[in-house]
From Swiss-Prot:
Its main location: membrane. Residues 297-314 have a biased composition (Polar residues). It is found in: Cell membrane. The gene is MAKR3. GO terms for molecular function: kinase inhibitor activity. InterPro entries: BKI1/MAKR1/3/4. This is Probable membrane-associated kinase regulator 3. Coiled coil: none annotated. Keywords: Cell membrane, Membrane.
Amino acid sequence: MDLHESESRTHVLSTDGDDGYIDMEVNLSSSSSSSTSSSSFFSFPVTSSPPQSREFEFQMCSSAVASGESTTSPADELFYKGQLLPLHLPPRLKMVQKLLLASSSSTAATETPISPRAAADVLSPRRFSSCEIGQDENCFFEISTELKRFIESNENHLGNSWSKKIKHSSITQKLKASRAYIKALFSKQACSDSSEINPRFKIEPSKVSRKKNPFVNSENPLLIHRRSFSGVIQRHSQAKCSTSSSSSSSASSLSSSFSFGSNGSLDLQTLMRSSNASDNSIEGAIEHCKQSFTTRKSNVTESELCSSRTSVSTCGDLDKD
């Protein structure tokens, strides 16, 4: 049976300025039968104003397929190769479901049916909306802030633990030092006691006597090794005042010596006596310096008076002459 469709007449402006219109006729004829091929004919008669009118035709032959047969199109081939997104049709969805089940059979096989939207989401690139992107960014920001807080809390905890450990170690070191000091004191006393027991290690007080600094606070035996600046100045002043009496020198020599007791510790009475003797020697030296200064002044005044008298007497003798 032949199907003939009517022609369509179109009027198009020509490029030439003199010509008004170009008449074009399109005739489409198609025939379909039980045979496997059909042909379509397109004829385009063109009429123009010039006398040399041309008429040309286009012919197109297309192969038709019987209704009972099915052929594979390039889209199907691309779909099988995975290069084409699936259409939302039941057979395609079943194929996608089979492929997914085959791929996930190694890990976990799920037989739930896949909706068209889920299949499209699986095989199509995901398109994020602005709301979804904003939510993801918010989640990422919250996670990052929580991680930062967790790290900072851990660092603070570690820092506090280290500081506590350092403080504890310093305290333990101080305690150990104090214990060692106390043990040393007790060991010294024990050694002194043992020296008393053994006559070979008995120490005579005359040999152990040392020269003591008279300007040290004798009441506190722990500060014996320290010296004061004022003590040095007083020592220099005593060196200058070398014309002190023999009593003050003997007192200073007595005060500069101290002895150990029977138990190895310093005798407080001897220390007090030495401190009193040193104070007396200092006072005696100061008084001696004052006396020497006054005697020098008196000698100077007497010499000045004598010189003035001699000068006056010489002047009187000259006047008499």
